[in-house]
Amino acid sequence: MALAARRKVRIRLYGTNPADVDQVAREIVDLAKKMGVQVRGPIPLPTRRLVVTVRRAPSGQGYHTYDHWEMRISKRLIDIEASERVLRRLMTIRVPDTVKIELQLI
């Protein structure tokens, strides 16, 4: 295969369920290794923690009690030196609704 046909692809995975993110990352790495391309990752990126504090009492009277709601966003990064054939195979991977994928050609 010609060198011009190979490109580096940066894949960013993120989602609220870390098990789903890890499972999709494992599938991508296994597919890339099976096809014989160079893979770097999955690299765990810092988990983003979103916290929302709300007052329990709707009227403002009474005790000052608060609820804390939290959502954690897990992220993984994978670099692949891939050809068009590998990218087509990557598109066939089933991805849960809780996982989002960004592809970037570098």
UniProtKB/Swiss-Prot annotation:
Annotated source species: Pyrobaculum arsenaticum (strain DSM 13514 / JCM 11321 / PZ6)
Signal peptide: none
GO process terms (BP): translation
Subunit note: Part of the 30S ribosomal subunit.
Cross-referenced PANTHER family: 30S RIBOSOMAL PROTEIN S10 FAMILY MEMBER (PTHR11700)
The UniProt record lists the keyword Ribosomal protein: yes
Coiled coil: none
GO CC entries: small ribosomal subunit
Family of this protein: Belongs to the universal ribosomal protein uS10 family.
Protein name (Swiss-Prot/TrEMBL): Small ribosomal subunit protein uS10
GO molecular function per UniProt: structural constituent of ribosome; tRNA binding
Keywords recorded for this protein, A-Z: Ribonucleoprotein, Ribosomal protein
Membrane is among the record's keywords: no
Function as written in the Swiss-Prot or TrEMBL entry: Involved in the binding of tRNA to the ribosomes.
Gene for this chain: rps10
